[in-house]
Structures are given as C-alpha cells and as structure tokens.
Amino acid sequence: MNKLDFQKKITRLFNKKHYADIKKSAPYPFTVTYHTGSLETPANSIESINAALNDGAEILEFDVTFRPDGTAVIIHSGSPSQTEGVLLDEALAAVAKSDKCKINLDIKSVANLPEVDRLVKKNGLFERCFYTGVFDYWVDTVKKNSAIPFYLNHKITSEEATDKNAAKALAQKAIEMGVIGINSNYKTASKLFVDTMHENSLEVSLWTVNKPKNMASVASLRPDNITTKKPHILNDMK
C-alpha cells in the first residue's frame, strides 16, 4: 500500500468514527476545492494539478501572478522574478485534459489580467474559471480588465457574523459589485452570515479548513464551498 492509499484509508476510518452525525443529517451540496499543494504535492506545480485531477477534484486552486514582463505564472508571490513560476498556459493546458474540473484562480496581482483571459479562452476553460483573492480595492480593476467572474475576498467581522443587518449591508455591497459571492477565512464565519448571503443569492466559500476537528462544524454552516489541503476527509463527509 503506497502512502496516498494509506492516507485515504486512515481518513475514512477517522470519518466513520467521528462524523457519523454529518452522514445522518440532511445532505447539503457543498463543493470541495483542492488547495494547491494538496495530496502532499508541491504547491503551484503541474504535479499538484495532475494529482487533484486524478483524484477526481471538482475544483482545484492555484495562485496566479505575473513576471516583470507580464507573463502569467502560477506562484504564491505577488512579484516573482523573470524566471520564477510555472507558466499559467501550461497549468491551464493540464486542467483542460479534464472536461469537468473547475479552477479557482487565486490572484496575487492584477498587473496583466487581460493575459489571463486570453489564456483561459485559448484553453477552452472560460466557463470553468473564477477568481478569488479579489479584495475590495481590486474590484474595479478586475471588472475593467477581465471578464472572468469572481468572489469578493472579505474578512467576516464579528458584527457581520452576529447581526443580520450588518450581514445584509455587506450582501448589498457585494451585489452592487457584481460578485459571485464571498470568499473568507472560515474562522469568523457563522450560520447567520451564510444564511444571509444565501437569502441574497450570494455564494459563500470558506478557506482553508485542514484540521479534521474543524471540518464538521464548518460544514454545518452550509457554505457552498470549502477549500482544504485534506480533501479526502471532506469528501467522505458529503
């Protein structure tokens, strides 16, 4: 038994013991995004992409930025050198081998977004791509330079997590921005917040939930998506 098969076996045994309550509850169709570097692969690599695809990922994520000459690459740094990063074109070509998997393009720079659009269209993936990493100060730039839909990156405040009016105010702001929904760290999310976004036709994506002890509670909030480096555990909860 190789290391990956052993990991799958252990996580399934863990789930059977600790997550029976989730299985008994009414199913909720959240997606699981494979964070770049999942399945013990190097982050922002073709190896990571292929591993996620071979594992049947619904959505995979990698970071997108630009070299000084504007070349689009996948790497976490927002300002790589002229020789750093894997070409975005190569990464997209790898995903294009799948006819289903969607891509979360986590942008670290907005320096040359038209190039991202060009490469996404070239690889026939426009209907399967969306941005995260878009904070409010980047929204106008993204809308002006790219046709790819996006989530608003937002840290949920304690008021937004507990007060419906505050959550509604954020929802209205998000609607005016024209975003798909809210992408946020799971630690400050609440059921009230998620429900309020859903009432306003906005999706909620929560990141990055890697500890098994946190997964059941996050899933119980009923987000639309959960991003993780431990996808087998979350997939077994669905």
Give the positions of each predicted feature.
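Phosphate-group recognition and catalysis centered on beta-loop-alpha active-site segments
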Residues: 1-238
